[in-house]
């Protein structure tokens, strides 16, 4: 057999490291395995290996080496082996490693790796067949092995169906399904869409299950009636073949009820028809942890012909554990935050608070998004010229539907000298602001305005609300995050007095980092988001710590001071933690005496 070899010495690892290649081949021989190359080109080496087994002769393996060998793991398939787990049913790739890449060690020979892991996988399969579950669990990763992921390589790239992880399905073999569908921007060969599986119903009788939906949806959506059918795995690989199996099952189930067959057949003739296949698959590890798995098959009429194009659309399970990667999220879903100032610090803080699962977020700012803001604002070109609160509100509304976002396009504390403008006001601004603060669990001030800070700090202390302020310094050389609890010693005025008297450290500033952009009538400081987000993230951490101290450690400091430079040079971000003691010149400090 002539094996094609192509590429420079540095492009092919076996040529770049000939000694390693020789050791790899010798390792197979050391285990009594024969080998021959199937392909050896463009950085890829695939060996056909006859691996000896103690009692069953040998197993043929195809061993694919990564172009970045030895740093990255190999791919090993067993074309003639059929395992119920730990093997892709289509490619026959063996799952000998978990998803944790740290299990592959560059110094090991692939043959030694096979000798260790293959026997372990086969032992696990024997234990599972004998229902020795605890023994099997001690040898394999305790993770489910669902059917669905093995089919996703043939799924459409840009379409998606979202469904309730606790979706209730009628005790029936088939029925109709209600989808909410929205077209997406044209990409790929098939017009993409996103859909929500709202409800599945039996063909007859009344089904009382509550329809499923997202908390909020934006833009035009339409109702699409589809079908659902129960099938049993295994399934063929091609979507057309799965749909053909579903059609046969529908025909069999509807044989006694011709009207039902006609109804489901008319759905199949729609320009876009969705058939949901329900089946049992592992949802969690263990012998009795199966639940409903879903395939979504889409049949589209090809324009100008009678042909139809069938594809598989990826389904995404939405459930109460969606935020399980962030344990504090469950404690935040009932919390209300008012954030004042949506600039370089506040815009990122707003996004992170919504991302973290805060239940209610009200954002307040008076400014518009300038093109020059792009280098240090959370959103980009598509929102230039919009009010900052509008841009953030719309982004958060679309992307974090479990957070209710309110907005106020206003400058807190601004005075008016025109009588006509006062008459245009919709109520008393003070009453509006006080109502927001009274209803909130915490106020976050990223306005970078000492006037605004003084007013909000006073109102929060008098009303009894927690208050967090955060801002960067000139030239993005440092920053400050301070947090105040109602009734706690040390207040905003105390902080200012300590800074004035130099009894608390000040953050670093770079007075040369101030510019007046062309066309702008106010100075601003230089600095990019990659530095300023240091402050934003501590604002968020401090806010979450005050909102949910039992879940997320809030720390025992009141003041965090950030330095990003020292002696004119960049340093690694350095935070200093301080306590704000009551100051003798402040009324709260005097009361302590």
Curated annotation (Swiss-Prot):
One of its GO terms (molecular function) is tRNA threonylcarbamoyladenosine dehydratase. Disulfide bonds: none annotated. GO terms for biological process: cyclic threonylcarbamoyladenosine biosynthetic process. This is Uncharacterized protein y4oA. It comes from the Bacteria. CDD domains: E1_enzyme_family. Keywords: Plasmid.
